[in-house]
Amino acid sequence: MSDSNNISSLYPPPPPYVKFFTKDNLERLAEYQSSHVTTDPEQITCELDFLIPPPVPSAGHYRAFGSVWQVKDELPDLETVGLRNLYDDRGQHGNNYQYKIKELHKLLKSLLLNMLELVSVLSVNPERFPDKVEHIRTILFNIHHLLNEYRPHQSRESLIMLLEEQLEHKKEEIANIHAICDKVQAKLAAMCKQYIADD
């Protein structure tokens, strides 16, 4: 068997600096942090520096679990990815979601039309289908991009609906509690009247 067919371990081995996390080092850490002033938190001067967590990245990117992640999660433009933008989004950034919904409807109609055209091209001249398939692909990428731009609004609306449902549920519970309290008070008042009448 070749070395390339070997199964790698399910979990990666622990980093080498894990051996510095001993009980003695943890006890010395507070004293070390108070006496030692660091100008560069990335610089390692002794084994206790491994116990101090690195600063949270504020810009650019970072590496975690073998992947590179952007600090600010932004949706790239279609042009930067190398695709043609089929809708006009100049001046439409931000919270103009009605515009995005209208553009989605336009793209869906265009997709249906192109699917019909693809069927007709396949029935008449099957060799000409790659251009139509590429156009459908571009439309689908544009729809996908618009849907991704719409996700923050959808999340906010879903959260609002969830909170409104919880509020209605709490109001119903409070109304039920008040009704039960009224019944208990009426029952106690009736018992008091009966007790006074018996005396």
From Swiss-Prot:
Presence of the UniProt keyword Glycoprotein in the record = no
Transcription as a keyword of this entry, yes or no, is yes
Q: Where in the cell is it found?
A: Nucleus
Transmembrane regions: none
Assign the protein's first listed, main location to one coarse class.
nucleus
Q: Which InterPro entries match?
A: Med7/Med21-like, Mediatior_Med7, Mediatior_Med7_sf
**Role of this protein:** Component of the Mediator complex, a coactivator involved in the regulated transcription of nearly all RNA polymerase II-dependent genes. Mediator functions as a bridge to convey information from gene-specific regulatory proteins to the basal RNA polymerase II transcription machinery. Mediator is recruited to promoters by direct interactions with regulatory proteins and serves as a scaffold for the assembly of a functional preinitiation complex with RNA polymerase II and the general transcription factors.
Q: How does it assemble?
A: Component of the Mediator complex.
Q: What is this protein called?
A: Mediator of RNA polymerase II transcription subunit 7
Instruction: Tell me the organism.
Output: Eremothecium gossypii (strain ATCC 10895 / CBS 109.51 / FGSC 9923 / NRRL Y-1056) (Yeast)
Give the lineage.
Answer: Eukaryota, Fungi, Dikarya, Ascomycota, Saccharomycotina
What gene does the UniProt entry assign to this protein? Answer: MED7
